[in-house]
Amino acid sequence: RLAESAACLVRDASDPGPQLRRLLEAAGQKLPESRPWLELNPAHPLVARLNLLPDGATFDSLAALLADQAQIAEGGVPPDPAGFVRRLNEWLLGRH
């Protein structure tokens, strides 16, 4: 599951994915809170770079970017879409 991706969200087998969750909630169903965990691909260059960074703002920015990318890859929306765009732009422009 992490052949090419830097990270992915892993859910319990009984936990519906984000699309089914939205569909069920739109139908009025109450669902327990989803608690996926972030799985990192240690062979991916971004994760290797994260591993070399000291704690601080740059580390936090890349870690948040990887978590948001994992959320998007599974069809979800990052908790702070504007923050995701800002962080992505900073990395693309080399201003992280």
Per-region residue spans from a language model:
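Long, intrinsically disordered, charge-dense linkers/tails
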Residues: 1-96
